[in-house]
């Protein structure tokens, strides 16, 4: 992942979720964890129109071993994380994933269900059930965002769980951090993949 010559190697992660699921927060925590993990350039940004609960939202995390000088994210990401699998029918999610990329979904289904003709790796984990099990529920809403950070760590190998846990701890009070870290760990352990994924040359 180190830079070669003058070219910046930037890893692009796109988050797809719905308003209220915490996708933007997850993107920001991942950026912070990547920085803790030693990446020199990190950014996180949301993309949505009128934000309302339940409406589709998109957020991006970008990180690089060298400072990021290109502000515009690439059209296709190395990793796409989907907080609500029903969005697969509502949004062209695969259109924003590189042909050899990694798709991570909050789903109780096996990863093979989401395999396509594209040469992608697929990872699934039932973050919703795990979040409910550990008590990540606020006003009836199950908070799955930090759980999927655990799935990201296991499936991608790009950011360590240790760094994710440190970033989570910096964003929540001690009691909430403990619950979120437990959810992330359990989701990490429960993550299933159709095959091992390795990062190819990331684009700018």
Describe every region a protein language model picked out:
Residues 2-204:
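Active-site cofactor/cluster-binding pocket
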